[in-house]
């Protein structure tokens, strides 16, 4: 089977670019029962590469916490599309849909038999839908606008945020999974300003 784990100190992997690197115990890898097959979220390994002789493939559709990969690629002198994408963050809710779509396309174009899905996830799954404490009164103060509560809610909900009014003065707002860039009240106010216009 395929697992995701931390590398053993001194473990080595030959990457797709031909470079062999020595890993430390802070590096996340995708591995089989013997050794790493990929530097997680950065680059695949040469010994698991697809060739013209390949008959069986294993598709990876992953989410890695940006903090787990931050700086790892650069520390090995690597910069890949994958490392850039994962360091910036990807939607953690799309993995299964993406895997199903890719599998369907491969099956349609190339034929073949589709195998089972296996999942590797940590014991403690990261909670991604942290509610943001939001004071609606801050919107008009910061933006110089005169928006009503219903205007603010309409703006947020149009961007797929979930709003719960705990009281008139304090709301909780949960970002959609694809908006991992929204972390604080100021980010929400910026989104409202962008939608409603800063000169209202």
Can you name each region flagged by the protein language model?
Residues 1-200:
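RNA/tRNA-interacting regions in translation and RNA-turnover enzymes
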